Amino acid sequence: RRLNADKNILYWEIGRLIKQDLYSKETTLHRIDTFKYLSRELVERYGKEFEVRHLLQMELFCVYFPELEIVSDLSKKLTWTHFLKLFLIDNKLHRDDYAKACKEEGWSSSVLHGKIMKLII
């Protein structure tokens, strides 16, 4: 559990840095090139978990869950897969409610996915 929580926080921090650095400085086209360059560098050093799509997910993590304290608390029970499923929910209130339910009721990521699909449909 501790490793999982640390991984979630690492991904959130990377997302925060990406958001902070790229949103303020880059146009959309430059952002894409920067993501590709950053991804190449990180994949070469640390492996495939830093491919472009993963970096985009990390950035989204910081956007959807902007408070580190909340991420830290949720990460005690939720895996990265839980967070990826929560990204499917556009409505912040619904997303927060589902995250809280996952934590309190111990939903697996599969159970969460099923409940989200019912919400979306």
Label each PLM-derived region with a short phrase.
Residues 1-121:
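Basic, low-complexity intrinsically disordered segments
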